[in-house]
Structures are given as structure tokens and as C-alpha cells.
Amino acid sequence: MTRTIICRKYKEELPGLERPPYPGAKGQDIFDHVSAKAWGDWLKHQTLLINEKRLNMMNAEDRKYLAGEMDKFFSGEEYAKADGYVPPAQ
């Protein structure tokens, strides 16, 4: 049976993640409050930010920036978008 949670981003009951995506308290918080759908949406957005802003995951400042954007993304705050990116038509 799929575990459901009240998603912090989408404010509705949705299927949760199968396991915490990070170790420690941060991973447990995401596991408890972020749906699998929201996590998948974040991974796509994270990839877009890394590529478009040319972030280097070996650089501590870039990792800190991305972690801050992830918090904003899940909490509903205004988060960074890739400059000039136009999503494909559906």
C-alpha cells in the first residue's frame, strides 16, 4: 500500500516518497512532508537550474544556493527560474 502524506508544496494528500532522499533531519523532513510528485518536480527544476545557471556541485556556495532554492520551492515562496527558459508546449 502506498504511503500518503499532506504535501507541503501542493497542499493536498498525495503519495509520499519511498525513503528519505537525504540522510539526517533534512531528509526526514522531506520524507514526512513532500510528495513523490513534488520531489520529481523539484528534481526537474534542480536540473534546469544547474544547467542554465552553470552551477558546480563541487562548489559549496552553489550547493548552498541550490539547497535554499529547494526550501523555497517546497514552501511556496518565490524561487529562482532559469532566465529565458520557455517550457515546451504540452
From Swiss-Prot:
GO cellular component: cytosol
Biological-process GO terms, alphabetical: cellular response to oxidative stress
GO molecular function, one term: iron ion binding
The keyword Iron belongs to this UniProt entry's keyword annotation: yes
SUPFAM superfamilies the record matches: YggX-like
Keyword terms of this UniProt record: Iron
Role played: Could be a mediator in iron transactions between iron acquisition and iron-requiring processes, such as synthesis and/or repair of Fe-S clusters in biosynthetic enzymes.
Family to which the UniProt record says this protein belongs: Belongs to the Fe(2+)-trafficking protein family.
Record PANTHER family: FE(2+)-TRAFFICKING PROTEIN-RELATED
This protein's name: Probable Fe(2+)-trafficking protein
